[in-house]
């Protein structure tokens, strides 16, 4: 009976997630009435809770552990709190962005509970704390206008944080990426990404002459080189690409972009020659089967898992994702593909793409160049991190050890990503307020002109 329920549950989750994904892009349509958009967003919200409930029915049936039901209730309350708080405190916030945040958290909770209950429990409490922190950020974005003047402070704090990790950080898989403070492991580079975007936007939003570009490039290079020195090459790549995109959009000069790509290619060749763990990952990427007993074991297990899942997956607890090393962090996408299926995994990618499109949409709508660059930079950080994660586990590119935002286990990544989404929400609200103020000004102007005409007659 349990196997039958697992099988039915699998197809139900795929159907509901495909429906949710369709609604993501339906909400982007321009010619849609406000009430229709509200119906779409409400249906999305219902789909989130149905998928969550369906998955935990299976988890409880397989584990026969009452604590799973308690944990399910706690997660459902958290998801409801996120939805309610954003609507209560920020009625002008983007419900689509909030829905996507909750959906990605839900998928993460489901898979982490299945893979490691202890990791899922820690992730839940971090998400709870992250929600509290992130709810403050939209207020700051709207009311603290001088934040654009603090760009040098952002750069100094970011560089110092990265230096501390390089000097006194913990080594994990060949890279120094975290610090232990009072028994808690923190990965500063996750937060420095946000500071870095604000720094670059602050430098380039007013002036893009050659001198300013050179100074900004030098400071950006310092960030990247510190990460390279600590052997966090995945993080260095994210910083590099983010800066390149922001620089090109700010200056609109193809020369800078092409030059940056050339420097990036040279740096990649240099990294291959300098770092042994980079060579190991390249070997595992080129021909993992030839080194399946050593360097290629992780990527081979990842590919086996994805292949085993097929289009519809094996169902929760019916696969063997725990054979993949570090599956809760870098390779959680493989576990999702194996047990929930290729269709579910593709829908997950599409939801991530819809988030990125939302970021770009907000960037294009912002009138002030500073906020435009911030939205674009944060969107690039998010999208490129998703690309590195999924590209690594599918053997599209060499593995970089980057986590899947909001889904993978990782406290610093989760908190930083929720803060990133909160900044975007703040920008969205700011744009809504700008639009309303412009409409009022236009209405006043029209009313004044009408009065002048009436006086003439």
Q: What do the predicted segments below correspond to?
A:
Residues 18-25, 83-84:
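Alpha-helical transmembrane segments
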Residues 389-457:
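A juxtamembrane structural motif centered on a specific transmembrane helix
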Residues 22-40:
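Membrane-interface helix-loop junction between the first two transmembrane segments
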Residues 64-295, 334-392, 419, 423, ...:
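Hydrophobic alpha-helical transmembrane segments of multi-pass inner membrane proteins, especially
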Residues 1-17:
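Hydrophobic transmembrane alpha-helical segments in integral membrane proteins
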Residues 306-343, 363-366, 370:
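Long extracytoplasmic/lumenal interhelical loops at the membrane interface
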Residues 35-41, 120, 189, 212-215, ...:
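Membrane-interface alpha-helices at helix entry/exit sites of multi-pass transporters
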